[in-house]
Amino acid sequence: MNIDRIDKPTREQYEEYILKNQPFIITGVVNNWISFNKKWIPSQNIEDDYFLSILENKGIPVREIGIDVGEWLGKTKNINFSIFWKKWREHYFNFKNEKNNQSNNNNNNNNNNNNNNNNNNNNNNNNNNNNNNNNNNKPKYYLASLPIQTYFKELINDFEIPEIPKEQNKNGNLWIGFKDQITPLHHDWSSGDPGMDGLHAIIIGRKQFKLFDPIVNVNCFKRKKEWGKFHQSEFDLDNPDFNKFPEAKNFKIIEIQLNQGEMLFIPKLWWHHVKTLEPSISINFWFQHIGSELLKSNKLWCHMEQYLNAVFEMDATKISNDKFKKIIKYLTNDNNGGDGDGDGDGDQIIQKYKDDNLKLIQLPKFIDSFSNAVNNPIFKNHPKKDQFKFEITEKVNQWIEEKKKEINENKIVIL
Protein backbone atom coordinates (compact mmCIF):
# COMPACT_ATOMS: atom_id res chain seq x y z
CA MET A 1 0.00 0.00 0.00
CA ASN A 2 1.28 3.45 -0.90
CA ILE A 3 0.30 6.38 1.28
CA ASP A 4 -0.79 9.75 -0.08
CA ARG A 5 1.46 12.78 -0.36
CA ILE A 6 -0.25 16.17 -0.03
CA ASP A 7 1.39 19.54 -0.58
CA LYS A 8 0.36 22.20 1.96
CA PRO A 9 -2.76 20.34 3.14
CA THR A 10 -5.78 22.34 4.25
CA ARG A 11 -7.45 21.93 7.64
CA GLU A 12 -10.18 19.93 5.92
CA GLN A 13 -7.62 17.52 4.45
CA TYR A 14 -5.98 16.99 7.86
CA GLU A 15 -9.42 16.28 9.33
CA GLU A 16 -10.22 13.81 6.55
CA TYR A 17 -7.17 11.63 7.27
CA ILE A 18 -7.57 11.91 11.04
CA LEU A 19 -11.15 10.64 10.79
CA LYS A 20 -10.15 7.89 8.33
CA ASN A 21 -7.32 6.93 10.69
CA GLN A 22 -4.95 6.85 7.71
CA PRO A 23 -1.36 8.17 7.48
CA PHE A 24 -0.16 10.61 4.84
CA ILE A 25 2.99 12.59 4.01
CA ILE A 26 2.88 16.40 4.17
CA THR A 27 5.10 18.42 1.84
CA GLY A 28 5.57 22.15 1.34
CA VAL A 29 5.39 22.95 5.08
CA VAL A 30 8.59 22.01 6.92
CA ASN A 31 10.77 23.35 4.11
CA ASN A 32 9.40 26.83 4.86
CA TRP A 33 10.48 26.80 8.50
CA ILE A 34 13.42 28.98 9.59
CA SER A 35 15.04 25.89 11.12
CA PHE A 36 15.00 24.12 7.75
CA ASN A 37 16.45 27.02 5.80
CA LYS A 38 20.05 26.74 7.01
CA LYS A 39 19.52 27.94 10.60
CA TRP A 40 19.74 24.48 12.20
CA ILE A 41 22.20 23.06 9.68
CA PRO A 42 25.62 22.74 11.39
CA SER A 43 28.23 25.22 10.22
CA GLN A 44 31.65 23.92 9.17
CA ASN A 45 33.09 26.71 11.30
CA ILE A 46 32.20 25.76 14.87
CA GLU A 47 32.40 29.41 15.92
CA ASP A 48 29.43 30.13 13.64
CA ASP A 49 27.36 27.22 14.94
CA TYR A 50 23.83 28.40 15.74
CA PHE A 51 22.98 25.76 18.37
CA LEU A 52 26.22 26.30 20.27
CA SER A 53 25.72 30.06 20.24
CA ILE A 54 22.42 29.83 22.12
CA LEU A 55 22.46 26.44 23.89
CA GLU A 56 26.13 25.76 24.69
CA ASN A 57 25.95 25.76 28.49
CA LYS A 58 22.45 24.34 28.86
CA GLY A 59 22.10 21.11 30.84
CA ILE A 60 19.90 18.55 29.09
CA PRO A 61 18.68 14.98 29.73
CA VAL A 62 19.99 12.64 27.02
CA ARG A 63 19.60 8.92 26.40
CA GLU A 64 22.65 6.71 26.63
CA ILE A 65 22.97 4.24 23.79
CA GLY A 66 23.42 0.51 24.34
CA ILE A 67 22.71 0.34 28.07
CA ASP A 68 19.86 -1.94 29.07
CA VAL A 69 18.41 -0.56 32.28
CA GLY A 70 14.81 -1.44 31.59
CA GLU A 71 14.17 1.94 30.00
CA TRP A 72 12.74 1.64 26.51
CA LEU A 73 14.77 4.41 24.86
CA GLY A 74 17.94 3.98 26.92
CA LYS A 75 19.37 5.19 30.20
CA THR A 76 18.81 8.88 30.97
CA LYS A 77 21.76 11.08 31.86
CA ASN A 78 22.13 14.85 32.28
CA ILE A 79 25.01 16.43 30.38
CA ASN A 80 26.02 19.81 28.99
CA PHE A 81 24.48 20.46 25.57
CA SER A 82 27.85 21.43 24.07
CA ILE A 83 29.29 17.98 24.88
CA PHE A 84 26.40 16.28 23.13
CA TRP A 85 26.25 18.65 20.16
CA LYS A 86 29.98 18.63 19.36
CA LYS A 87 29.93 14.83 19.18
CA TRP A 88 26.82 14.84 17.01
CA ARG A 89 28.41 17.46 14.71
CA GLU A 90 31.42 15.21 14.29
CA HIS A 91 29.16 12.29 13.36
CA TYR A 92 27.18 14.52 10.98
CA PHE A 93 30.24 15.79 9.11
CA ASN A 94 31.81 12.31 8.96
CA PHE A 95 28.63 11.08 7.32
CA LYS A 96 28.53 14.01 4.88
CA ASN A 97 32.19 13.50 3.93
CA GLU A 98 31.67 9.77 3.43
CA LYS A 99 28.65 10.45 1.25
CA ASN A 100 30.59 12.99 -0.82
CA ASN A 101 33.54 10.60 -1.22
CA GLN A 102 31.25 7.83 -2.43
CA SER A 103 29.66 10.20 -4.92
CA ASN A 104 33.08 11.31 -6.20
CA ASN A 105 34.28 7.72 -6.49
CA ASN A 106 31.18 6.78 -8.47
CA ASN A 107 31.80 9.70 -10.83
CA ASN A 108 35.42 8.67 -11.26
CA ASN A 109 34.38 5.12 -12.03
CA ASN A 110 32.02 6.30 -14.73
CA ASN A 111 34.78 8.39 -16.33
CA ASN A 112 37.50 5.75 -16.11
CA ASN A 113 36.01 2.51 -17.32
CA ASN A 114 39.43 1.09 -18.19
CA ASN A 115 40.48 1.17 -14.53
CA ASN A 116 37.33 -0.37 -13.09
CA ASN A 117 39.01 -3.17 -11.18
CA ASN A 118 41.52 -0.90 -9.47
CA ASN A 119 38.91 1.69 -8.71
CA ASN A 120 36.55 -0.90 -7.24
CA ASN A 121 39.28 -2.22 -4.96
CA ASN A 122 40.16 1.28 -3.86
CA ASN A 123 36.50 2.12 -3.35
CA ASN A 124 35.97 -0.97 -1.20
CA ASN A 125 38.96 -0.06 0.95
CA ASN A 126 37.83 3.55 1.22
CA ASN A 127 34.28 2.53 2.08
CA ASN A 128 35.50 0.10 4.75
CA ASN A 129 37.69 2.79 6.28
CA ASN A 130 34.90 5.35 6.13
CA ASN A 131 32.42 2.94 7.71
CA ASN A 132 34.89 2.12 10.48
CA ASN A 133 35.55 5.79 11.13
CA ASN A 134 31.85 6.58 11.10
CA ASN A 135 31.10 3.75 13.54
CA ASN A 136 33.95 4.78 15.84
CA ASN A 137 32.66 8.33 15.95
CA LYS A 138 29.02 7.59 16.60
CA PRO A 139 27.71 9.64 19.52
CA LYS A 140 27.25 7.94 22.85
CA TYR A 141 24.06 9.88 23.50
CA TYR A 142 20.99 11.06 21.61
CA LEU A 143 18.00 13.31 22.30
CA ALA A 144 14.63 11.58 22.48
CA SER A 145 11.38 13.54 22.47
CA LEU A 146 12.45 16.45 24.67
CA PRO A 147 9.67 19.09 24.97
CA ILE A 148 10.99 22.22 23.27
CA GLN A 149 8.86 24.49 25.47
CA THR A 150 10.56 23.04 28.55
CA TYR A 151 14.16 22.51 27.44
CA PHE A 152 14.75 24.65 24.34
CA LYS A 153 12.64 27.81 24.54
CA GLU A 154 15.33 29.53 22.48
CA LEU A 155 14.18 27.47 19.45
CA ILE A 156 10.43 28.12 19.64
CA ASN A 157 10.40 30.73 16.88
CA ASP A 158 12.39 28.52 14.48
CA PHE A 159 9.42 26.35 13.43
CA GLU A 160 5.66 26.53 13.01
CA ILE A 161 3.43 24.40 15.22
CA PRO A 162 0.80 22.80 12.95
CA GLU A 163 -2.70 24.21 13.32
CA ILE A 164 -4.41 21.44 15.30
CA PRO A 165 -1.65 20.91 17.92
CA LYS A 166 -1.32 24.71 18.20
CA GLU A 167 -5.03 25.07 19.01
CA GLN A 168 -4.47 22.66 21.90
CA ASN A 169 -1.40 24.51 23.19
CA LYS A 170 0.76 21.54 22.23
CA ASN A 171 4.38 22.31 21.44
CA GLY A 172 6.97 20.24 19.63
CA ASN A 173 9.35 17.58 20.95
CA LEU A 174 12.95 17.55 19.73
CA TRP A 175 14.79 14.45 18.49
CA ILE A 176 18.48 14.49 17.52
CA GLY A 177 19.80 11.09 16.46
CA PHE A 178 22.51 9.27 14.56
CA LYS A 179 22.59 7.03 11.51
CA ASP A 180 21.11 3.53 12.00
CA GLN A 181 19.41 4.45 15.27
CA ILE A 182 16.27 2.41 15.96
CA THR A 183 13.05 3.24 17.77
CA PRO A 184 11.36 -0.14 18.41
CA LEU A 185 7.79 -1.06 17.52
CA HIS A 186 5.24 1.03 19.43
CA HIS A 187 2.29 3.37 19.06
CA ASP A 188 2.08 6.92 20.40
CA TRP A 189 0.54 7.55 23.79
CA SER A 190 0.82 9.73 26.88
CA SER A 191 0.57 8.88 30.58
CA GLY A 192 -2.98 10.24 30.54
CA ASP A 193 -4.16 8.84 27.19
CA PRO A 194 -3.52 5.34 25.78
CA GLY A 195 -3.61 6.56 22.16
CA MET A 196 -2.56 9.85 20.52
CA ASP A 197 -2.46 11.19 16.97
CA GLY A 198 0.96 12.49 15.90
CA LEU A 199 3.02 14.38 13.33
CA HIS A 200 6.72 13.77 12.70
CA ALA A 201 8.73 16.43 10.83
CA ILE A 202 12.30 15.95 9.59
CA ILE A 203 14.49 19.06 9.47
CA ILE A 204 17.79 17.29 8.79
CA GLY A 205 18.28 13.72 7.52
CA ARG A 206 16.05 10.82 6.43
CA LYS A 207 14.13 8.13 8.31
CA GLN A 208 12.52 4.83 7.43
CA PHE A 209 9.08 4.28 8.95
CA LYS A 210 7.46 0.85 9.11
CA LEU A 211 3.76 1.40 9.73
CA PHE A 212 1.11 -1.12 10.75
CA ASP A 213 -2.60 -0.43 10.40
CA PRO A 214 -4.22 -1.32 13.77
CA ILE A 215 -7.30 -2.79 12.07
CA VAL A 216 -5.41 -4.95 9.58
CA ASN A 217 -2.90 -6.03 12.24
CA VAL A 218 -5.33 -6.27 15.14
CA ASN A 219 -3.95 -9.47 16.71
CA CYS A 220 -0.38 -9.42 15.41
CA PHE A 221 1.51 -7.69 18.22
CA LYS A 222 1.33 -8.45 21.92
CA ARG A 223 1.80 -5.53 24.27
CA LYS A 224 4.45 -5.40 26.95
CA LYS A 225 2.97 -6.01 30.39
CA GLU A 226 5.01 -3.43 32.28
CA TRP A 227 3.82 -0.14 33.71
CA GLY A 228 4.58 2.68 31.27
CA LYS A 229 5.28 0.23 28.43
CA PHE A 230 1.80 -0.94 27.48
CA HIS A 231 2.11 0.97 24.18
CA GLN A 232 5.18 -1.07 23.21
CA SER A 233 5.24 -4.39 21.39
CA GLU A 234 6.87 -7.51 22.82
CA PHE A 235 7.69 -8.51 19.26
CA ASP A 236 11.13 -7.31 18.11
CA LEU A 237 10.88 -6.36 14.46
CA ASP A 238 14.68 -6.28 14.11
CA ASN A 239 15.15 -9.75 15.61
CA PRO A 240 11.85 -11.51 14.89
CA ASP A 241 11.08 -14.67 16.85
CA PHE A 242 8.08 -16.21 15.12
CA ASN A 243 8.27 -19.33 17.28
CA LYS A 244 7.62 -17.21 20.36
CA PHE A 245 5.20 -14.86 18.59
CA PRO A 246 3.53 -16.91 15.80
CA GLU A 247 0.71 -14.37 15.50
CA ALA A 248 3.22 -11.82 14.15
CA LYS A 249 3.65 -13.87 10.96
CA ASN A 250 0.44 -12.34 9.67
CA PHE A 251 1.44 -8.70 9.90
CA LYS A 252 0.91 -6.39 6.94
CA ILE A 253 3.48 -3.61 6.69
CA ILE A 254 3.57 -0.20 5.01
CA GLU A 255 7.16 0.93 4.56
CA ILE A 256 8.03 4.52 3.69
CA GLN A 257 11.07 6.78 3.59
CA LEU A 258 10.49 10.22 5.09
CA ASN A 259 12.85 12.79 3.64
CA GLN A 260 14.31 16.04 4.87
CA GLY A 261 11.64 18.75 4.74
CA GLU A 262 8.70 16.31 4.95
CA MET A 263 6.22 15.55 7.73
CA LEU A 264 4.32 12.33 8.41
CA PHE A 265 0.89 12.05 10.01
CA ILE A 266 0.82 8.94 12.24
CA PRO A 267 -2.77 8.13 13.22
CA LYS A 268 -3.95 7.00 16.62
CA LEU A 269 -2.90 3.46 17.58
CA TRP A 270 -0.88 2.80 14.43
CA TRP A 271 2.09 0.65 15.37
CA HIS A 272 5.34 2.02 13.96
CA HIS A 273 9.05 1.23 13.91
CA VAL A 274 11.57 3.93 12.99
CA LYS A 275 15.12 3.68 11.66
CA THR A 276 17.27 6.78 11.17
CA LEU A 277 18.97 6.52 7.78
CA GLU A 278 21.15 9.61 8.23
CA PRO A 279 22.17 11.81 11.17
CA SER A 280 18.90 13.58 11.85
CA ILE A 281 17.07 16.37 13.63
CA SER A 282 13.30 16.02 13.90
CA ILE A 283 10.34 17.53 15.70
CA ASN A 284 7.20 15.62 16.55
CA PHE A 285 3.82 16.84 17.75
CA TRP A 286 1.15 14.86 19.60
CA PHE A 287 -2.47 15.94 19.76
CA GLN A 288 -6.02 14.78 20.39
CA HIS A 289 -9.08 14.86 18.15
CA ILE A 290 -12.61 13.98 19.19
CA GLY A 291 -13.26 12.36 15.82
CA SER A 292 -10.41 9.88 16.19
CA GLU A 293 -11.13 9.49 19.91
CA LEU A 294 -14.57 8.16 19.01
CA LEU A 295 -12.84 5.39 17.08
CA LYS A 296 -11.53 4.03 20.39
CA SER A 297 -15.06 3.12 21.44
CA ASN A 298 -15.93 1.36 18.18
CA LYS A 299 -13.57 0.04 15.49
CA LEU A 300 -10.44 0.54 17.65
CA TRP A 301 -11.98 -0.79 20.87
CA CYS A 302 -10.20 -4.13 20.39
CA HIS A 303 -6.91 -2.32 21.05
CA MET A 304 -8.31 -0.76 24.22
CA GLU A 305 -9.24 -4.27 25.37
CA GLN A 306 -5.70 -5.45 24.66
CA TYR A 307 -4.38 -2.48 26.61
CA LEU A 308 -6.61 -3.32 29.58
CA ASN A 309 -5.56 -6.98 29.44
CA ALA A 310 -1.89 -5.97 29.45
CA VAL A 311 -2.44 -3.91 32.61
CA PHE A 312 -4.42 -6.74 34.20
CA GLU A 313 -1.67 -9.28 33.42
CA MET A 314 1.16 -7.01 34.58
CA ASP A 315 3.46 -8.58 37.18
CA ALA A 316 3.22 -5.87 39.81
CA THR A 317 5.63 -7.69 42.13
CA LYS A 318 8.48 -6.59 39.84
CA ILE A 319 7.72 -2.92 40.57
CA SER A 320 9.47 -1.43 43.57
CA ASN A 321 7.27 -0.09 46.36
CA ASP A 322 8.64 3.42 45.80
CA LYS A 323 7.69 3.39 42.12
CA PHE A 324 4.33 1.78 42.83
CA LYS A 325 3.64 4.43 45.45
CA LYS A 326 4.16 7.11 42.78
CA ILE A 327 1.75 5.28 40.46
CA ILE A 328 -0.93 5.13 43.16
CA LYS A 329 -0.28 8.75 44.10
CA TYR A 330 -0.79 9.78 40.48
CA LEU A 331 -4.00 7.75 40.10
CA THR A 332 -5.52 8.73 43.46
CA ASN A 333 -4.09 12.22 44.03
CA ASP A 334 -3.11 10.93 47.48
CA ASN A 335 0.22 12.32 48.71
CA ASN A 336 0.67 9.28 50.93
CA GLY A 337 0.34 6.87 48.02
CA GLY A 338 -2.83 5.39 49.48
CA ASP A 339 -6.34 5.00 48.13
CA GLY A 340 -7.99 7.38 50.52
CA ASP A 341 -10.05 4.71 52.29
CA GLY A 342 -7.91 4.65 55.42
CA ASP A 343 -7.56 0.89 55.17
CA GLY A 344 -4.03 0.26 56.43
CA ASP A 345 -0.75 2.15 56.17
CA GLY A 346 0.99 3.11 52.93
CA ASP A 347 2.84 -0.19 52.44
CA GLN A 348 -0.27 -2.24 53.20
CA ILE A 349 -2.31 -0.26 50.71
CA ILE A 350 0.38 -0.63 48.03
CA GLN A 351 0.43 -4.38 48.62
CA LYS A 352 -3.35 -4.51 48.12
CA TYR A 353 -2.91 -3.04 44.67
CA LYS A 354 0.03 -5.28 43.87
CA ASP A 355 -2.06 -8.30 44.77
CA ASP A 356 -4.95 -7.22 42.56
CA ASN A 357 -4.32 -5.34 39.30
CA LEU A 358 -8.07 -5.04 38.80
CA LYS A 359 -8.18 -2.78 41.85
CA LEU A 360 -5.76 -0.48 40.03
CA ILE A 361 -7.82 -0.53 36.83
CA GLN A 362 -10.98 0.38 38.75
CA LEU A 363 -9.53 3.66 40.01
CA PRO A 364 -11.59 6.52 38.52
CA LYS A 365 -8.54 8.36 37.18
CA PHE A 366 -7.37 5.26 35.32
CA ILE A 367 -10.83 4.76 33.79
CA ASP A 368 -10.99 8.46 32.90
CA SER A 369 -7.67 8.21 31.04
CA PHE A 370 -9.54 6.51 28.18
CA SER A 371 -11.65 9.66 27.74
CA ASN A 372 -8.84 12.09 28.57
CA ALA A 373 -9.51 14.17 25.44
CA VAL A 374 -12.73 15.59 26.93
CA ASN A 375 -10.55 17.54 29.39
CA ASN A 376 -8.91 19.37 26.52
CA PRO A 377 -10.28 22.95 26.70
CA ILE A 378 -10.75 23.10 22.93
CA PHE A 379 -13.37 20.33 23.16
CA LYS A 380 -15.29 21.98 26.01
CA ASN A 381 -18.34 22.67 23.86
CA HIS A 382 -17.89 19.90 21.31
CA PRO A 383 -21.28 18.25 20.59
CA LYS A 384 -19.80 14.73 20.69
CA LYS A 385 -17.72 15.18 23.84
CA ASP A 386 -20.27 13.76 26.28
CA GLN A 387 -21.22 10.95 23.90
CA PHE A 388 -17.60 9.84 23.65
CA LYS A 389 -16.99 9.95 27.40
CA PHE A 390 -20.15 7.96 28.08
CA GLU A 391 -19.44 5.31 25.42
CA ILE A 392 -15.80 4.66 26.28
CA THR A 393 -16.44 4.72 30.06
CA GLU A 394 -19.29 2.24 29.65
CA LYS A 395 -17.06 -0.09 27.66
CA VAL A 396 -14.24 0.06 30.22
CA ASN A 397 -16.69 -0.61 33.06
CA GLN A 398 -18.24 -3.51 31.13
CA TRP A 399 -14.77 -4.96 30.63
CA ILE A 400 -14.14 -4.66 34.40
CA GLU A 401 -17.43 -6.39 35.26
CA GLU A 402 -16.72 -9.23 32.83
CA LYS A 403 -13.27 -9.68 34.33
CA LYS A 404 -14.74 -9.77 37.84
CA LYS A 405 -17.18 -12.43 36.70
CA GLU A 406 -14.38 -14.53 35.21
CA ILE A 407 -12.44 -14.26 38.47
CA ASN A 408 -15.48 -15.22 40.57
CA GLU A 409 -16.10 -18.21 38.33
CA ASN A 410 -12.47 -19.23 38.87
CA LYS A 411 -11.69 -18.85 35.18
CA ILE A 412 -8.84 -16.51 36.07
CA VAL A 413 -6.31 -16.93 38.85
CA ILE A 414 -4.81 -13.67 40.10
CA LEU A 415 -1.08 -14.16 40.53
From Swiss-Prot:
JmjC domain location: 127-302
GO molecular function: 2-oxoglutarate-dependent dioxygenase activity
Listed transmembrane segments: none
Biased composition (Low complexity): 104-137
SUPFAM superfamilies linked to this entry: Clavaminate synthase-like (SSF51197)
Region named Disordered: 97-140
Disulfide bonds: none
Protein name: JmjC domain-containing protein C
Species the sequence originates in: Dictyostelium discoideum
Lineage: Eukaryota, Amoebozoa, Evosea, Eumycetozoa, Dictyostelia
Gene: jcdC
